[in-house]
Amino acid sequence: MSGADADRRAALQALAMLPLGVALGGCGGGSDGSPQPPLVTRSWQLGFSPTPPVPTAAAVVQGIDLWSQRAELVIIHEELPWTDLLAGMSASAILDRDKVALANYLRGKGLAFAFMADLTDGLAREQEAPQLRALGRSIAEPAVQQVYRDYVLAVNNKLNPRYLGLAAETNLIRTAASPAVYAAVVQAANDAAAALTAAGSTATLFSSVQVETAWGGLGVGGSFVGIKQDLLDFAFSQLLGFSSYPYFRYAQPEDIPADYYSRLATGQPRPVMVVEGGWTSASVGAIASSPEAQARYITRLAQLLDGVSARGLLQLEFADIDISTVPPPVPVNLPLFTQIGLTHSDFTAKPALAAWDQLFKRTLRAP
């Protein structure tokens, strides 16, 4: 998914998170005195990213106000502002400028906060971050890794996230990027984890793996690979993040194996959280899909989450990305990821939103 992944990440930086208020039923029995059937529960909180369908402040606020009614979590997932950092601007100043007000607004909605500091090009895992490439720099440089540590320490101190991600889709990086880049990601993430621990951070530290890659890659027929190496290389992780876009591998949501998540989670003690993913609501390229298939995926996803008593589900897109507003050059694979939102780009609902709302109505319980 490396090339598509790059475009996906660009598209996915925006969409919104939709908190849903859980309505609890009355405590008594039925009218005839018989006990009511038990309410369906969930162990997983729900959430989105605040990225908007179009790049305007009004769309950001409108999206947050909508999805915060159907979520408990929010995630900011992005590459680092390397240009400013390596020009000497402090991480704290950058966060004050770009993130503190947003984080406060999100917390005002009652949302628990997650942050992923992505170390490579989310749109092309075989490459370093775009700003580093433009500067002729590399994550393999000790000075660049120091800037990364300073940034995540500032994120911890200024934004106080409940969950703090230090590396994304590590197995895909190992598969697609050079050994030197992967080794640098391992080093940088582990050193950052040590620095956060030494600083007394209370955030739950995590990294993520790409589920389709772990099952053998995109398309049907690849052999199961697993994530053993990732568990060893990122042993600091207190939570195991999953990235999953199974429409690249399966024609229908019902084709996803029942052990799609549990096979990866078995034998390791960390709780699981889906930190990004989705299913397109439209056919694109060789992929055939529909709004109804996307809604069925949401229902199937709940079964997979229940199978691992997951901690959370985060979808980076709440609304579709309006590709006409993406500044050129538009990545060639971006259309593969622009229609995984639960609403259209004008925030009108798709069938998948009703399916999501049904999940949100479940009573939230301890995992």
State what each model feature region is:
Residues 256-311:
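Catalytic-core region of carbohydrate-active enzymes that cleave or remodel glycosidic bonds
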Residues 1-22:
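N-terminal secretory signal peptides and thylakoid transit peptides that target proteins
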Residues 37-143, 165, 241, 247:
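N-terminal substrate-binding region of glycoside hydrolase catalytic domains
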Residues 189-222, 273-278, 312-318:
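Aromatic-lined carbohydrate-recognition surfaces of secreted/lumenal glycan-active proteins
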